[in-house]
Amino acid sequence: MRMKWLPAGIGLFLVGMSVVSFADGRVYEQAEFPHEICGTWTDIHGGRTLEIAPRAVDGDILDGMYDVAGGGVKGAVKAVLLHEGQSVTEKIGWNVMSPNYQILVYGSQPYYRLTGRHFESVDGIYLGMEMEEVRQLYGEPDHKGGTFPYLNWSYEKEGVSVYFYGGIVDGIWINKGSRKTFDRSGLNADSPRDSYAAYYKAGGPMNEFFTAGEDESEYISLYEDRVCLGSGPY
C-alpha cells in the first residue's frame, strides 16, 4: 500500500501529523478531516444522517488516515476510527466543489447536501440531479460503465453521456454531431468557441474553459469530439 503524497497547498487537513507503520502501509496520526466536509450529511431519503467533526465520525474518534488522495473540496482517504475500543477502517470520498450539490461516500453509503439549484442543463438533466430522475427523463442507457461511486451512462441516439458520483449527476457530455444542446444557451459540441465566449465567462490562465451561473460554479470544457459540463474543468 503506497501513500499518495499531495501537492503543495492541498491536503491541509494533515495537520500536526506523525507517520507510523500500519497494515503494511503508512498512517498519518493526529490528522483532521477538512473543514469542507465537517457537519451533518443526509442520505437520499433523509432517513439516515452522518455527523463529521474534525477528528471524529458519529462520535468515533479519528485515530489516523492513509491512502490519502486530493483534499479540501475533493478527495478520498481511508480513516482509522476507534469504535467501542476497536480500530475500524472506513474509506471516505467526497466532492464538495459545488455550492449547489455536495456528495460524500462513507464506505458504500452515499450522503448528500443538495439544494436543487443549477444554471445549465441538457434536456432538463442538470448537475446535482439524482440518478433515478435521469432514468425517468431518458430511460435506460445504451451503455453503463464505471465502478461505484463513479458511474456513467451513455445514450447513443441522443449523443449524450451522463457521469455520476455517488448516484448524483456530476458531469454531462454532449458528443460531436448530437442535436442536443444546453438548455439556456442553445449551444452544443458543434457550436463555435466564439459563441461560448459570447454567452459564458472564460476562465483559466489560457481561457481554456468557461464558467456558468451567477456563482460561476459550473464549468464547460470544449474538445474536438465533445463539450463537457461539470463542477470543475475537465
Which stretches of residues belong to each language-model region?
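Short, recurring structural edge motifs at helix starts
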Residues: 118-124, 180-185
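N-terminal helix-cap/turn-to-beta initiation motif at the start of protein domains
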Residues: 22-42, 53, 123-127, 131-132
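Beta-sheet ligand-binding and adhesion/scaffold domains
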Residues: 25-32, 44-47, 78-116, 214-222
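Short, solvent-exposed coil/turn segments at beta-strand boundaries
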Residues: 35-38, 51-58, 73-74, 95-102, ...
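Short beta-strand-to-coil "C-cap" segments at the C-terminal boundary of structured domains/repeats
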Residues: 54-55, 111-116, 230-234
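A cross-family detector of function-defining hotspots
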Residues: 129-180, 185-234
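N-terminal glycine/threonine-rich, aromatic-flanked beta-hairpin/loop signature
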Residues: 43-88, 173-174
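Amphipathic/hydrophobic helical signal segments and adjacent flexible N-terminal regions
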Residues: 3-7, 11-38, 108
